[in-house]
């Protein structure tokens, strides 16, 4: 049937900030949905609090609301925009939960649900209702019981044997779930799960540890046409969250009979749940001992796995699901890649591997064992002709300096057994190492329960290593076999060097391959195993078993101008969706100029790897071997390395030397900006202040240099992103401890030492330069003091406390740096304002993580403007082309946007709830996974919105617990006064309480944990504390501080860990009390105001 005509205006709900369990896969689905609905002529209204998304660009919707995703916001938008229907299935768990909250409020009126109706959502999401539905259609389920309090939960212990699986309902990424083995663990996890479930419901079921896990991506339409888009198999057995498991598509160890049973079961489940206009993900488990198959759960929406399945097959799941939601049937929808009907089930003739990316190194003390609660922050995908090739390419894609199955260290056999038995991010590497140590497939299966087929494949890779020595350089057949098995040039060189004590590089292997014509072949992802011609080139490389003909390896369309954009690889802390946003904008800008675009990336979650973002997509590891192969094939007229973060930037010099034309800022300039010594000399010549700094190549030299500079100092290794291993140290003892624990210092890896400007205000500046003119796009003032990583700091645009004269001075210094450095394109500079003196902290001649925020706040798409400048070289013309809202002031020497009549605030979002044992304290090492944006008429309201959107739900009244480190106690009176003025009662332990009382305010004294009961921990658990202000000395995560912060996370209590944000919070609470922050206004309205 054709599209629905009874609806005109559709509200699309986004997923909010990037968090563990919900990443940028929902920007991919949301962007596809918005584009599809607009093309069909619907009026699209969109809500999402995340500015770093493509879907929140003003052109993708008729009205874009960058607002907290709450029931109140949505009801206000529905009323204001006269919404006819809501599409909640493209924004993950966040969108489903809020949609159900709105539905249950009874205030929706005639507004319809698209994609999945409320009844279907309840059936799919409420574990008890889902269980009843499965029983009705004869599906097998784990033995289980539901509970709504601890007493009810205890009944399960009498009926189901340990170990027990506990799952919280309506949570994200397995939050509140886990396996318990005894009563102590049962009590702790049960109480946590009940607290985390928004409906205080938990499921207690028999453990399925060691069972095989599978997923089916299913689509169903109103006419009951059903297709399986993709089957996915988890290499890790049940017990590891599917988001943290290594997965394979298609499923490889199912028999045909098992597959057909699972396929039919999936269709029956969608029919019973009532999903008839979209896609769903259904998860199964199979007992390897007897073949018993049970249903685990289903998601009645587009999911993380949907994004993977879409990229694995080339089937546009989000677009098809959107079309189904508005009335089309599968046979009426055309597959954009092949032009065939969408009712054809995809067929693939290759193997896809997904490996999750973790960043445990950012969270000392966090539990790194993998379980049923998700912990990964990103993922990579690789495509190969065989499992061996695919898995080795995936390992190379992780950006962990892996060359494949690298050797890993272990203490002894018992340690190796422990590391294999307990799932962790390196488990497959330990499995490979165990084969090298003589373990059998049977022994390893008993330890890890990974299917013997996968273990055998890994063993064959390890066994083949024995054949790789210097003879491979002259043995064409052996070298070809190594390459068809996925061995990288780098790994082959390492193995030869290990055997024969040589010093071969990957280049040496490359030249041998070229001489022997062992060259990468590029194949298409086309959903049909080559049966139909692909209209959209989406490519991966493999080494064929026989020699290639030259025509098979050459790219077509050589006459067209084309530019290759290198993406950022897997999401991780320090390099996230913001960089993919810039890459996508680069592609759009090149298309605007008629340039053919080539996107190169390995992240399946992103918009950049969507089939219609660029003209050609290469899904390959971002390493030199694979980059070189694509550049040799395509021979692009330019390569952009500046938008994908540090990942592509580190290849600038090698690619330039190889002959690739880097457009924009040159490799020489990039290298100079990274060289601290050269760059310090450059800044000194310009007469710009910078903190005293030095480098050290040994511990003793570091101690000497730090003493000369004067404590406190900021220390870090060179060449880092996201402030990794960066720390403020206050004395020699702390410095020696840091040098011992955090870095490996040497002549090749010096440590950088900078004067730390205590209590300074940090400033972020984004600018664009064409060599003649400079556009200072945004001057952002950080809310938190200097010393907290810029990626973790909230910031305001325009600045709140920096006068116009100082802003002009900052703009001038930015222009001086950009013009003298030779920047062509984007530039980010971090300044610090200390005692009214401006200091330059850092310069990055590339896209920064604030580019999306500044673009949204000002209405100028900075990455698009910069791309145009990099290709055509004229900044003013590029600005005029994209200045839709007429915000640029062209009358000044240094170009700047006009001061807006509103305030924008960016706030960071953190993963502490998912990483038990980690501290909330912020510092120079970045720890946030995502961001939100608040826009309103003033700072107080904007900051209030940013706190609501980042899940720090500030109370309007109640008790504030204040605990300040000694250094901060002088500000006690100021903090106390602000919160007393708002009507809050104060509570504190000894020292801080005394300070508050002496300041003239009432304060309830509460015991420290070591002083008796009731103490502060009891008060937190009992819900007697409604807001916590807790500052502590760096790295003092112990005692009371540790217990306080663990309970803050467990009971979701709002908190501040530094004074400036606590003071900003007081202003926000005033706005919340007055309800002024609840006003909603679209981004388009703000930009036109």
Swiss-Prot record:
Binds 4 Mg(2+) or Mn(2+) ions per subunit. Mn(2+) 3 binds at residues 830, 842. Residues 952-1089 form the MGS-like domain. Residues 131-326, 680-871 form the ATP-grasp domain. Residues 952-1089 are annotated as: Allosteric domain. Pathway: Amino-acid biosynthesis; L-arginine biosynthesis; carbamoyl phosphate from bicarbonate: step 1/1; Pyrimidine metabolism; UMP biosynthesis via de novo pathway; (S)-dihydroorotate from bicarbonate: step 1/3. PROSITE patterns: ATP_GRASP, CPSASE_1, CPSASE_2, MGS. GO terms for biological process: 'de novo' UMP biosynthetic process; glutamine metabolic process; L-arginine biosynthetic process. Pfam families: CPSase_L_D2, CPSase_L_D3, MGS. ATP 1 binds at residues 127, 167, 173-174, 206, 208, 213, 239-241, 283, 297. Mg(2+) 3 binds at residues 830, 842. Mn(2+) 1 binds at residues 283, 297. Residues 554-951 are annotated as: Carbamoyl phosphate synthetic domain. CDD domains: MGS_CPS_II (cd01424). Mg(2+) 4 binds at residues 842, 844. Composed of two chains; the small (or glutamine) chain promotes the hydrolysis of glutamine to ammonia, which is used by the large (or ammonia) chain to synthesize carbamoyl phosphate. Tetramer of heterodimers (alpha,beta)4. This is Carbamoyl phosphate synthase large chain. The lineage of its organism: Bacteria, Pseudomonadati, Campylobacterota, Epsilonproteobacteria, Campylobacterales.
């Amino acid at each position: 049937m054709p599209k629905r005509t009874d609806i005109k205006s559709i509200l699309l709900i986004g997923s909010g900030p990037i968090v563990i369990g919900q990443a940028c896969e929902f920007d991919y689905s949301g962007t596809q949905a918005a584009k599809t609905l607009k093309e069909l002529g619907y009026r699209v209204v969109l809500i999402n609090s995340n500015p770093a998304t493509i879907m929140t660009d003003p052109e993708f919707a008729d009205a874009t609301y960058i607002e907290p995703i709450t029931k109140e916001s949505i009801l206000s938008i529905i009323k204001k925009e006269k919404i006819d229907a809501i599409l909640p299935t493209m924004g993950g768990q966040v969108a489903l939960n809020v949609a159900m909250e709105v539905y249950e409020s009874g205030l929706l009126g005639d507004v319809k649900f698209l994609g999945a109706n409320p009844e279907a959502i309840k059936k799919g999401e409420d574990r008890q209702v889902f269980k009843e539905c499965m029983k009705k259609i004869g599906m097998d389920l784990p033995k289980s019981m539901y509970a709504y309090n601890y007493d009810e939960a205890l009944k399960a212990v009498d009926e189901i044997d340990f170990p027990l699986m506990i799952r919280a309902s309506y949570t994200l990424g397995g939050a509140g779930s886990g396996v318990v083995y005894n009563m102590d663990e049962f009590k702790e996890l049960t109480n946590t799960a009940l607290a985390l479930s928004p409906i205080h419901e938990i499921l207690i079921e028999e453990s399925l540890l060691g069972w095989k896990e599978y997923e089916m991506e299913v689509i169903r339409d109103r006419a009951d046409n059903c297709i399986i888009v993709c089957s996915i198999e988890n290499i890790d057995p049940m017990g590891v969250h599917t988001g943290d498991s290594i997965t394979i598509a298609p499923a490889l160890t199912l028999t045909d009979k098992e597959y057909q049973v699972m396929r039919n079961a999936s269709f029956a489940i969608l029919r019973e749940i009532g999903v008839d206009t979209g896609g769903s993900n259904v998860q199964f488990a199979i007992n390897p001992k007897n073949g018993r198959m049970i249903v685990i759960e289903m998601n009645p929406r587009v999911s993380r796995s949907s994004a993977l399945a879409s990229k694995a097959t080339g089937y546009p799941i989000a677009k098809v699901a959107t079309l189904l939601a508005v009335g089309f049937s599968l046979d009426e929808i055309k597959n954009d890649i092949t032009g065939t009907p969408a009712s054809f089930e995809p067929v693939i003739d290759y193997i896809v591997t997904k490996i999750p990316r973790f960043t445990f190194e950012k969270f000392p003390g966090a539990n790194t064992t993998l379980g049923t609660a998700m912990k990964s922050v990103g993922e990579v995908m690789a495509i190969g002709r065989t499992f061996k090739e695919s898995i080795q390419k995936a390992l190379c894609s992780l950006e962990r300096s892996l060359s494949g199955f690298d050797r890993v260290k272990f203490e002894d056999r018992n340690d190796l057994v422990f590391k294999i038995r307990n799932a962790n991010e390196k488990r497959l590497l330990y499995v490979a190492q165990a084969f090298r140590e003589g373990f059998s497939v049977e022994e390893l299966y008993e330890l890890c329960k990974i299917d013997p087929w996968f273990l055998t494949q890994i063993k064959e890779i390890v066994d083949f290593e024995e054949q790789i020595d210097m003879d491979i350089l002259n043995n064409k057949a052996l070298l070809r076999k190594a390459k068809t098995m996925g061995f990288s040039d780098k790994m082959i060189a390492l193995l030869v060097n290990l055997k024969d004590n040589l010093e071969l590089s990957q280049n040496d292997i490359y030249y041998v391959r070229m001489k022997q014509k062992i060259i990468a072949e590029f194949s298409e992802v086309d959903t049909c195993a080559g049966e139909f011609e692909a209209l959209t080139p989406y490519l991966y490389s493999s080494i064929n078993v026989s020699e290639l003909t030259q025509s098979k390896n050459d790219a077509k369309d050589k006459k067209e101008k084309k530019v290759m954009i290198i993406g950022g690889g897997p999401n991780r802390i320090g390099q996230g969706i913001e960089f993919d946003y810039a890459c996508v904008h680069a592609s759009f800008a090149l298309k605007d100029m008629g340039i053919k675009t080539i996107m190169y990336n390995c992240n399946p979650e992103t918009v950049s790897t969507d089939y219609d973002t660029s003209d050609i997509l290469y899904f390959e590891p971002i390493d030199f071997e694979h980059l070189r192969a694509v550049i040799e094939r395509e021979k692009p007229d330019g390569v952009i390395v500046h938008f994908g973060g540090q990942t592509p930037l580190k290849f600038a010099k090698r690619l330039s030397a190889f002959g690739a034309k880097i457009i924009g800022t040159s490799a020489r300039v990039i290298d100079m900006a990274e060289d601290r010594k050269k760059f310090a000399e450059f800044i000194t010549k310009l007469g710009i202040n910078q903190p005293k700094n030095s480098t050290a190549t040994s511990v003793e030299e570091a101690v000497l240099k730090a003493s000369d500079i004067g404590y406190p100092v900021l220390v870090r290794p060179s060449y880092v992103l996201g402030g990794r291993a960066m720390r403020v140290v206050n004395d020699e003892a702390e410095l020696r401890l840091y040098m011992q624990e955090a870095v490996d210092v040497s002549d090749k890896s010096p440590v950088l030492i900078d004067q730390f400007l205590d209590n300074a205000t940090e400033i972020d500046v984004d600018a664009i330069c064409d060599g003649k003119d400079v556009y200072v796009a945004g001057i952002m003032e950080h809310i938190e003091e200097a010393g907290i990583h810029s990626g973790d700091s909230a910031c305001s645009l325009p600045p709140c406390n920096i006068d116009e004269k100082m802003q002009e001075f900052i703009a001038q210094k930015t222009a001086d740096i950009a013009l003298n450095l030779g920047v062509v394109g984007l530039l980010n500079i971090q300044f610090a304002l200390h005692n009214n003196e401006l200091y330059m902290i850092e310069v990055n001649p590339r896209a920064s993580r604030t580019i999306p925020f500044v673009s949204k706040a000002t209405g100028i798409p900075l990455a698009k403007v910069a791309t145009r400048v990099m290709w055509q070289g004229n900044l003013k013309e590029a600005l005029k082309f994209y200045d839709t809202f007429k915000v640029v002031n062209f009358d000044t020497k240094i170009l700047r946007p006009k001061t807006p009549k509103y305030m924008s605030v960016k706030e960071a979002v953190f993963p502490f709830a998912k990483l038990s044992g980690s501290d909330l304290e912020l510092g120079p090492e970045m720890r946030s996974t995502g961001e939100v944006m608040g826009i309103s008429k003033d700072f107080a309201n904007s900051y209030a919105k940013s706190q609501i959107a980042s899940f720090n739900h500030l109370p309007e009244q109640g008790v504030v617990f204040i605990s300040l480190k000694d250094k901060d106690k002088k500000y006690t009176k100021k903090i106390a006064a602000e919160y007393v003025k708002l009507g809050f009662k104060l509570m504190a332990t000894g020292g801080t309480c005394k300070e508050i009382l002496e300041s003239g305010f009432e304060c309830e004294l509460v015991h420290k944990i070591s002083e008796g009961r009731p103490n502060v921990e009891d008060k937190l658990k009992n819900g007697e504390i409604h807001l916590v202000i807790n500052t502590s000395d760096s790295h003092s995560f112990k005692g009371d501080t540790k217990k306080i912060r663990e309970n803050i996370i467990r009971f979701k209590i709002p908190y501040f860990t530094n004074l400036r944000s606590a003071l900003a919070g007081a202003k926000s609470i005033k706005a919340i009390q007055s309800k002024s922050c609840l006003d909603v206004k679209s981004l388009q309205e703000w930009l036109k105001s």
